[in-house]
Swiss-Prot record:
InterPro entries: REV_protein. Residues 21-43, 78-103 are annotated as: Disordered. Escorts unspliced or incompletely spliced viral pre-mRNAs (late transcripts) out of the nucleus of infected cells. These pre-mRNAs carry a recognition sequence called Rev responsive element (RRE) located in the env gene, that is not present in fully spliced viral mRNAs (early transcripts). This function is essential since most viral proteins are translated from unspliced or partially spliced pre-mRNAs which cannot exit the nucleus by the pathway used by fully processed cellular mRNAs. Its main location: host cell. Keywords: AIDS, Host cytoplasm, Host nucleus, mRNA transport, RNA-binding, Transport. GO terms for biological process: mRNA transport. A motif (Nuclear export signal and binding to XPO1) lies at residues 71-82. It comes from Human immunodeficiency virus type 2 subtype A (isolate Ghana-1). It is found in: Host nucleus, Host nucleolus; Host cytoplasm. It holds the Pfam family REV. Homomultimer; when bound to the RRE. Multimeric assembly is essential for activity. The RNA-binding motif binds to the RRE, a stem-and-loop structure present in incompletely spliced viral pre-mRNAs. This region also contains the NLS which mediates nuclear localization. These overlapping functions prevent Rev bound to RRE from undesirable return to the nucleus. When Rev binds the RRE, the NLS becomes masked while the NES remains accessible. Residues 92-103 have a biased composition (Polar residues). This is Protein Rev.
Amino acid sequence: MHEKADGEELQERLRLIRLLHQTNPYPHGPGTASQRRNRRRRQRRRWLRLVALADKLYTFPDPPTDSPLDRAIQDLQRLTIHELPDPPTDLPESNSNQGLAET
């Protein structure tokens, strides 16, 4: 029941944000350059107030903390293969190798 109330409250908040957004159109119309500039400046301030109000009305939940699986995947993604040195071309001969070859 509590989840349903939260969902309805969220929908109401989103409806309010949408209504506020629709009632704040971008300014159009004739006028001098300073009049158009002032209209744009006032509209920008209204937009910033709308965004601030929307942030107060609807705050996003904190992202989930990384699970052990996510951390393991990130560790695997950070692995790199380092270049190995070339193997030696001439091997030293030892007595144990010669004995095996003769028998």
